[in-house]
């Protein structure tokens, strides 16, 4: 999804947002009580007029009755192809990734090197991880426990805590970050979501030297939805972009207009599955109902 500045052929760089499990290109980043173009992706577009701001959407549902998902390897190939189609990788770029999205970005960079498509990895100057479970999440196991009543997707299976493929991916990232020259910024949640800490501090830490994860007093859902331009996450991401894309902050002209494409599919999806949720909930224990409500709001 094109947010701002993407049609500018002379732009100096790109910033790509990548959502996580159960999210989409719009609702993951947008406060739920607001339904307009005034949110932090467009704020960044106004702060950095010479950058393209993008949001990548992909199928990453937790339950099969909500939709489909693909293995991380296939999602990574899909993201790499999308970047090539949009001519992203010809300029310096930064990724901002939430939860599963952070694993997807790491796997995409790994895939780019494996298949000799190194332009993207060479142009990647930094990654901001927002509550990314580098070694998996115990929530995935809890979700899987109710799989008899609500079949889970492959994305849930791959997110289980201490999964071997996640450890291997994180080891690859740690070993290759110095040679790739990729700066890393890490934020992690401190508040539970529906009583569950989705990504604990240990899993949120990729284990990089000179990278200190920053605790944020938000939950797994709200950490990626800054409500103001004075929020810590927004200011931190803005400074990170300015530093690693080496672009000056600019003020928008008074007559500037947003080029954001609205996407409210998440609201429609929830309306369509409400009957299914009620049917499933009748057969769940209290803790399983809590987990189901959590996943519905990711």
Regions found by a protein language model. Give the residues of each.
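Conserved BB-loop
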Residues: 30-34, 52-73
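Short, conserved loop/helix-junction motifs that constitute active-site signature segments
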Residues: 8-10, 47-48, 118-123, 176-180
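Short, surface-exposed "cap/lid" segments of acyl-processing enzymes
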Residues: 2-50
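Alpha/beta-hydrolase-fold catalytic nucleophile elbow
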Residues: 56, 130-131, 220
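Short aromatic-enriched loop/helix-cap "lid" or pocket-rim segments at secondary-structure transitions
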Residues: 28-30, 66-68, 137-144, 195-201, ...
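C-terminal catalytic-base region of ester-bond hydrolases, centering on the histidine
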Residues: 22-23, 52, 61-64, 89, ...
């Amino acid at each position: 999804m094109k947010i701002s500045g993407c049609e500018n052929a002379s732009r100096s760089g790109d910033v790509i947002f990548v959502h996580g499990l159960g999210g989409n290109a719009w609702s993951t980043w947008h406060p739920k009580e607001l339904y307009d173009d005034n949110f932090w992706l467009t704020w960044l577009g106004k702060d950095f007029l010479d950058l393209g701001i993008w949001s990548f959407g992909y199928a990453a549902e937790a339950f099969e009755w909500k939709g489909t998902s693909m293995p991380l390897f296939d999602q990574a190939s899909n993201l790499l192809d999308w970047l090539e189609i949009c001519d992203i990788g010809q300029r310096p770029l930064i990724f901002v990734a939430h939860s599963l999205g952070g694993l997807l970005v790491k796997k995409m960079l790994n895939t780019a090197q494996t298949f000799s498509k190194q332009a993207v990895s060479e142009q990647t100057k930094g990654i901001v991880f927002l509550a990314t479970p580098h070694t998996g999440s115990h929530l995935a196991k809890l979700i899987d426990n109710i799989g008899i009543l609500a079949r889970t997707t492959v994305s849930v299976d791959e997110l289980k805590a201490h999964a071997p493929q996640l450890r291997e991916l994180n080891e690859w990232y740690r070993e290759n970050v110095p040679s790739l020259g990729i700066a890393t910024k890490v934020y992690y949640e401190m508040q539970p979501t529906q009583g569950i800490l989705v990504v604990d501090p240990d899993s949120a830490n990729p284990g990089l030297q000179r990278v200190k994860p920053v605790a944020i007093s938000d939950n797994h859902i709200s950490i990626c939805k800054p409500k103001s331009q004075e929020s810590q996450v927004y200011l931190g991401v803005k400074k990170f972009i300015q530093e690693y894309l080496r672009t000056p902050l600019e003020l928008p002209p008074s007559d500037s207009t947003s080029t954001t494409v609205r996407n409210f599919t998440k609201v429609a999806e929830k309306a369509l599955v409400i009957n299914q949720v009620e049917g499933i909930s009748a057969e769940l224990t209290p803790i399983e109902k809590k987990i189901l409500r959590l996943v519905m709001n990711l």
